Amino acid sequence: MDFWKDLIYFFSFQDTNITNVLFGTIMLGFTCGIVGVLVVLNKKALIVDAVSHSILPGICIGFMLSGVKSPVYLISGGIIAGIIAVYLVDWISKTSRIKKDAAIAITLSVMFSVGVIFLNIIQHSGNGNQSGLSDFLFGKAATIVRNDLYVFGTMSALVLTIIPLFYQHFKIALFDPEFSKTIGLNRQFIQGLISGLIIISTAIGIQTVGIILMSALIITPASSAFFWTKNFKKSILISVLFATLSSIAGVFISYLSPDMPTGPWIIVSLSSIAIFSAFFSPKGLFTKHIKASKNTKKMLSDNVLKNLYKIGEKEAETTKARTIEEILNYRFTPLNELKTGLRLLKTKGLAIKAGSLWMLTEKGISEAKRIIRIHRLWELYMQKFMQIQSDHVHESAETIEHIMTPQLEAELLKLMGKPVNDPHQQNIPYED
């Protein structure tokens, strides 16, 4: 009962601190969800990590120069440090034999080390305003105040302006780089724009989840979204949804248990969505396994169905019941697979069992004719239109017969007419 009371109170927005943290993290998640799609498509995931670690010295310098923990100075310093980091990565990789991933590692390590040194200097400086500056390492969403919301809101508005304005440019540059060169699209500008969005979103977001976890907030929702779709627009919407839901979940868990840090719980929530997507999305591992299992069973039942029909075709008695031994003698199939295939045919209503005998139903005969018809039509098509020798067409037809749709079969018949025999002079069965 307390849970429901807490839930109602949480979403009643009566507590100013909860409201600030909730809306701040939602706006941050919204922004990072969009930027993350651009990052993943542009294969700049490692750059995000480099930028997030490199921002620390910029924040420290911003504090040293201003003497106060003002978001304007800290974020400005962080953005400048992020720009330097991106430039250093490009400069090192272009002017030396060092590859880009190594250049990223070098930049990340050096900049972060400098940041830690500056942070240590600040902590021993005696400046009372430095309290809480170390929270940028691991994040502390509870420190979000109303002024921070203005910063988050400005950033969200900036992203919402840039994405529609350059939507087609992003789409062409990310999905078809060669075409973008052909039409004269300034890819360097687009790359710079993406880098700019990475730097700004990272500089603003580290207060919430910290330098260590910031890259996860940008990369994870987008990576999860691509398990569900490859469409650019849909991936942005799904990524934003995942980031927003995770932000709400992280703040709510932190509200229920004040000892629980908000930022890490946002990332844990995102990771849970990512794991679920990796297994249960249309392209997930579990879903693929289910589809593969279904395809294997279909191919097995189709092959057993063909064999049953072909025995009858050979003897001109397709409705006659057959023993398992007869089926095995016609074409050897491991006994366990044959029994499984026959059970599948029975379940589908394509065959019936009478004692120890198996017989095709009318539906089974019709389906067997369709499979064999596709097989033999495809063999003829390959020989006639693709100029492939008749002794080289069987393997391809063995695959096509299981996957060709009725629409494609109709197109094939329209193209070829209604031929009587295949390349091996076997009769092509049609419905009566």
Task: Mark where each language-model region is.
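Membrane-interfacial amphipathic/re-entrant helices at transmembrane-helix boundaries
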Residues: 1-30
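Hydrophobic alpha-helical transmembrane segments
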Residues: 22-27, 75-80, 105-106, 149-154, ...
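Short loop segments and helix-boundary regions at transmembrane helix junctions
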Residues: 38-52, 56-126, 225-239, 253-260
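Transmembrane helix-bundle core of multi-pass membrane transporters
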Residues: 107-162
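Membrane-helix/interface signature in polytopic inner-membrane proteins
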Residues: 161-194
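Membrane-interfacial segments at transmembrane helix termini in multi-pass membrane proteins
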Residues: 262-310, 406-414, 418-429
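Short amphipathic alpha-helical interface segments
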Residues: 293-333
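Structured cytosolic domains appended to multi-pass membrane proteins
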Residues: 317-432
